[in-house]
Amino acid sequence: MLNQIMLVGLAALSLTACNKDAVEETAAPCGVEISSTAPAAGNSNFYYRGDIRVTLTDADSTAEISVDGVTGTSALAEDSKSLSFTPDAPLDPSTAYTFTVDYCGGSAPVDFTTSSLGTAIDDPSSLAGSVFALDLQADDVEIVIPAGVGSVLESYLEIALLLEVESADASTLQIFAALGKDSNGEEQEFCDPTLPFPDADFTGAPYFQLGPQTTTISAAGFDVEIRDLFISGTFASDGSYWGGGVLQGSVDTRPLVPLLEDCDSNESTPETDDDCEDGAICELVEGFGVACEDCGDGTDF
């Protein structure tokens, strides 16, 4: 049985803003309309490293996205209703752009502007000593992989991840992470060890990447292993915040089984024990069309 879930979280409001009514469509009688776009028309805060995403009301195998003056790849999902555009290089910060959705209903241009994230930091060393928090239950955090189970997983991740910059220069970033006492991330949980990361390449500043590396964190009172933990994001030019954050890793769900209803060791009964085995969470998410991965540790689960 498989019981490891690949988790990818995004912390960027600009990546999820949607607006159907503001999109100007040149309609044709094909029965397909644009349901939503990200960024929405008129959005002025789009993350410069974000993918453009469009959802249609019905399948259209001809649909694609292009961006004026930008090279990239337009991709259509298996359902032919969702499509995305990935630029070959990051967009410029604080810059106006237009992307166009070409589909069976015609062409729909959408104007948007990138946020200031991506603007150069004058003195990278000024980041030293700064502490940043990632609240995994914040409204602007979206669990995108596995699709459809974000709300389920978020209920188990009542933690904040704190990142402190130890040092930074034009080429190297040194950061260590720690868990907050609660999801607000206002205070470190000193009973849990810090999570050191190897020195990171900072030549792409203000963008940074940490990991991947395997680590163990405490969640809801249980030690949970995250394999290949990877964190990335972009610091604001004045170092006051970071955005466009991505946290990615494979979570071993076995220690979290007692969090399921009726699986608490103090409340379980012979009637519920069969539903509380190591693969219980995997069986739960199977209902959302999500399959766990092999833990790869030689066990049966």
Model-derived features: where do they sit?
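Bacterial N-terminal signal peptides that target proteins for export
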Residues: 1-6
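C-terminal motif of bacterial Sec signal peptides marking the signal peptidase cleavage site
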Residues: 14-17
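N-terminal non-catalytic regions of secreted/periplasmic and cell-surface proteins
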Residues: 20-64, 103-126
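Extracytosolic secretory-pathway proteins
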Residues: 23-27, 117-301
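Short beta-strand segments within Ig-like beta-sandwich modules, predominantly Fibronectin type-III
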Residues: 73-79
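Aromatic sugar-binding surface patches on proteins
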Residues: 79-85
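Short beta-strand segments enriched for Tyr within beta-sheet-rich domains
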Residues: 91, 95-101
